[in-house]
Amino acid sequence: MFTVISWIIIALEVIFIGFLTFMAIKKRKITLTENVWYFIPSVLILYALYATELVYSALDTGEKLIIYEFINIIKVCLNVFKPEIEYADSLLLATNGVYSVAFFIGVLLALGVFITFIINVIYYFFYAKIRISKILRSGCDILIADDDDADTYMHTYPNTILLLQDYPTRDVKKVYREKGIVYFVVNLNESALINRFSKFINNGKDYNIVCIKERDYTLKLVAVFKSFVKQTASENFYLHVEFYYKNFKSINEVVSADKEFSPYINCFNKYELVARKFIQNYPVTKFVPAEFFNYEKAIVKPDKKINVLYVGFGKMASTIFSASMINDKLVTENNSSLTEKFVNYYLYDKECNKDESKNKSFYNDRYFAQEYNKDEYFAPIQKNNNVEYKCCNIEHNDGAKDYQSKLTNNKDEFHNIIITLGSDVENVDTAIKTVLYLRQHDVENYHIFIRLKAESEEYKAFFDSQKITFFGGESYILNHSIIVDEALMARAKMVNSSYEEKKKAISKWTKLSSIKKLSNVYAGLNLRLKLNLLGYDLIQNDGQNFDGEIVSELVSRLGKQTPPVDAPYQDYLYFNSDGFNSANALSYQEKLRWNAFYLDNGYALMKKTDIKVISGDKIIKDDDSKKLHACLTTVEGLDEYHQQLAKELSKITNKPIEQELINVDTYKYDYSVLDVIKTFKEDSPMVIVKRS
């Protein structure tokens, strides 16, 4: 009987060993017994072995068994390092070989489970500490986010530590271990942050505290971070904090107005981030055929039309639209003179009253509410009428007819179609119907952008066309390259450096006002469109696609066309001449973009009498607190402004007005694209290539 019992125990041991082996292979770990529940089967096997020995001994000696002895076995089983059976006195061990095998397997199994458990505890404790230390030493992102958002973010940027305010439960810890998520627990107060990060302050590495989704303590976090920066004099810690769509702009303006801390605090909104990435990757020129452009002049041909259709106009689409109206400024020619080339926008919205803010005119009402007479102001910018807003459902007859009427089969028109209706299914369905209509009517000049939240390959399989682009998924938004975006900030700093080189007084990047920094960011975003107008493009640097000859070719071309710093004043007045070159066209395009940027941010014209010339390097021409700027005018108005500054400077310096017309830098900033192109090198994140 005891031999049979021993064989049963061996069978159970083999099953348990097989289970542990299977789990080790599945998890690809030898030290797999981090789960305390693995103790139960090993203890039960030991209990069966000791109980079998107890019964055998009692039968052999004729002693009466009592319940206490069976209870005492539990204590013996838990003390796996000191087996209570004396090998010399164990009758069953001495007489039954099968039981002996079962016993030694059971003891070794229990010891193995216990030892590997201890190894796991030590391993995970020190491994986590080592990983945290290694990540912190190299500079990293410190993430405050929900588990799903954290998983998405850390998957795209492993050099991230999750910051928790409360200790996670055992189940959550297990999930973190399985996903390789590194975390620490820190209270959100300045003393706790100082204690945790004091060793890494100003160590030459950057640390980004990223808070995804607005929370009850978000504003408190901003205040705590300010105190942290002030107490530590830190210049390498940055806070990136998300605010809801409706709260974002007003809070961002207040936070950014604090010049002491605004260089270190970035308020963001996911829709704004998507919009920036969208216009950076897909300017309105991106997919337009080469025959629409005159690359030698960097213009769109006068007889060509570019249309952008927004199918669905919620938060996502309206934010992209606003960014596009800033970025997608184009130029053409009329009688050998430069003029703006308007992109035609058609907005289809089936939920017209859901959010009133999205229905507002692109240009802020404040700008057009005033009467700008010529005596008090420079020439105001004329309002564009190239936006057509429709409140309709394109699934219904009237809406469908209007939508389809814009999708013309005309070789001189190109259609960018952006579909952001709502659910992924609805967006894909609308795209399928749109593609079918375009094919039926032989429309070739188009590109469709479909927003997919889920990034499902199954949805993408519905389309085999090169004229389809998907955007807007979670990993599209929740990642380091979008929220922190060092490449874009580096390009913005390049733009600012070029601007500052043309000034007599250099302003440190961190001391710039928030609007000027943001202006440089959008100037950096616009580089791809400018390159498209020249016949070039930007792509990711894979380490092998950099072509120095292309950069040299562009620098040589634009260098010959760009007036030198000490050039006569008249060399910049291309808008009064009978001809122009590509550098002139890009300068004019930059002026249009700059105007659009400041208009979108609520600025209006400053009165002529409010402009003050203090000295050659100190001119009061704007007021960020009132959102006023003297240069928010036409190119003709800018020339009048330039003349006024030269006259005022001439009174101060006693130099001829002709000399001060050269010294005043009004026009030179718009030619900065050449200086930015010069910075592209073999190790740049992006490289310039010729358009295919």
Please provide the spans of the model-predicted regions.
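Cytosolic regulatory regions of ion transport systems
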Residues: 2-46, 55-75, 85-107, 111-593, ...
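…; additionally, a secondary subgroup of soluble metalloenzymes is captured
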Residues: 82
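Active-site-proximal, well-structured secondary-structure segments within enzyme catalytic domains
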Residues: 600, 625, 629-630
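Aliphatic-rich, non-membrane protein domains
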Residues: 606-607
